[in-house]
A protein has these predicted regions:
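Class II aminoacyl-tRNA synthetase-like tRNA-binding/catalytic domains
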Residues: 2-250, 422-423
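Residue-level recognition of alpha-helix termini/interfacial anchor residues
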Residues: 59, 276-280
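Generic non-transmembrane alpha-helical segments
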Residues: 143-151, 264-275
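Acidic/polar loop patches that form or flank catalytic/metal-binding clefts of enzymes
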Residues: 156, 273-277, 322-326
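A translation/RNA-centric and nucleic-acid-associated enzymatic feature enriched
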Residues: 161, 171-267, 281-427
Length: 427
């Protein structure tokens, strides 16, 4: 039995083959008197492969009635193509129709808006744009693990359901088995003792606190998995569900953290440019004509390092009119970050030493007692892409920060224990 081969493999062939088996979906079908041309895609790459079907193929009359979206199994000969555009084509000897698609198939051969594709999310991976997105995402996911495994980081699976609010913002999705039509009460409040876990539980906003415990046991560790934020914000910077990468480096400070962040971003961009050239070219043509220049900028430049205080001063003196006021003690907005990366420095920037009042409790308090050893990596066209910090390793200081933030100390006893027993600097 002939083994199925993918289009990405066939198009990269070094020589013709007398018999290949291809399976995929019709993108276009052009019929003529004695033969027809079918463009087939199987999702393995952006490119289609052309199949030539002669009229003497057994079920030719059925084949020419097919429309975009139908699925086929094609057996035939891989030949050099005399036409322009691609090196190889297939001359079919037999075709099995696997599945038909009515003429109202929602993805006809034309460009579709993201808004329209969102209404058919179950079919949009078959579109060129979203097929490319998910192939790139797959390659990036592999590269993320490759990067950390090559540097002897341990991959940790942290809990999805948690009783801790890592970020302290309270924007969490609750998890409960209580009957919402008849919620049990105790002293006027919800009685979580009757809930599944016997206390309030939520979907995690971060695996960081958990992965820190492994960092302080196994050395370098990382987590890479789903994260949930109940932020009522309809911007490109906020999502209810996303996958987050959270490395922790033992015996490290903020300088080590910034260095790892730059190395990580440049590694991923390099890997993607090398492995996903065809898909990136699609985005460079139809989505962002400056894409490749932006990626080359990230790869080829050291990241500028700038303290938050200096960044605020630079922005205030820039003469640029911003929608949001720039003042010390306020977080930088996307417009501020993009000004720094796209107009002033014109390359990636790392802003560090942020005011403690706008950052999380676990970040190390600096000697000025006004700022913490936190950093954000900003890149052109996006703004913030990484946030990180040196963690507060001093037991007394961390305990006081928990108190100052009005957190329940009892919820963080285990986290404090990691500083109580053999604490070390980490980031």
């Amino acid at each position: 039995m002939t083994e199925r081969r993918k289009i990405i493999e066939l198009l990269g062939s070094e020589q013709a083959s007398p018999s290949v088996l291809l399976k995929g979906w019709i993108r276009t079908l052009r019929e003529s008197k004695d033969f027809s041309f079918i463009e087939i895609n199987d999702g393995s790459c952006l490119a289609n492969i052309q199949v030539i079907v002669d009229s003497d193929v057994e079920n030719y009359a059925e084949i020419v009635k097919l429309t975009t979206g139908a699925s086929l199994a094609v057996t035939g000969e891989l030949l050099e193509s005399p036409g322009k555009g691609q090196r190889w084509e297939i001359r079919a000897s037999s075709i099995e129709i696997l599945g038909v698609a009515p003429e109202d198939f929602p993805l006809q051969k034309k460009r579709h808006t993201d808004e329209y594709l969102r209404t058919i999310a179950h079919l949009r991976p078959r579109s060129n744009k979203y097929g490319a997105i998910f192939r790139i995402r797959s390659k990036l996911s592999y590269a993320i693990h490759k990067f950390f495994q090559e540097r002897d980081f341990q991959w940790i699976h942290t809990p999805i359901i948690t009783g801790s609010d890592c970020e302290g913002a309270g924007e969490m999705f609750n998890v409960t088995t209580l009957d919402l039509n008849d919620v049990p009460k105790k002293d006027g409040a919800i009685d979580y003792e009757q809930d599944f876990f016997g206390k309030e539980a939520s979907l995690t906003v971060s695996g960081q606190l958990s992965v820190e415990t492994f960092c302080l046991s196994l050395g370098n560790a990382y987590t890479f998995g789903p994260t949930f934020r109940a932020e009522n914000s309809n911007t490109s910077r906020h999502m209810s569900e996303f996958w987050m990468i959270e490395p922790e480096i033992a015996f490290a400070d903020l300088q080590d953290d910034m260095a790892l962040g730059q190395e990580f971003i440049q590694y991923l961009v390099n890997y993607t440019v090398a492995e996903c050239a065809e898909d990136l070219a699609l985005f460079a043509k139809f989505v962002d004509k400056n894409l490749m220049a932006t990626l080359e900028n990230i790869i080829n430049n050291d990241f500028i390092r700038l303290s938050y205080t200096d960044a605020v001063e630079l922005l205030q003196k820039s003469g640029q009119k911003f929608e949001y006021e720039v003042k010390w003690g306020s977080d930088l907005q996307s417009e501020h970050e993009r000004f720094l990366t796209e107009q002033h420095f014109k390359q990636p920037v790392i802003v560090y030493d942020y005011p403690k009042d706008i950052k999380a409790f676990y970040m190390r308090l600096n000697n000025d007692e006004k700022t913490v050893a936190a950093m954000d990596i900003l890149v052109p066209a996006i703004g913030e892409i990484i946030g990180g910090s040196q963690r507060e390793e001093r037991y007394d200081v961390l305990k006081q920060r928990i108190i100052d933030m009005n957190f329940d100390e009892a919820d963080y006893w285990w986290y404090l224990d990691t500083r109580k027993y053999g604490t070390v600097p980490h980031a």
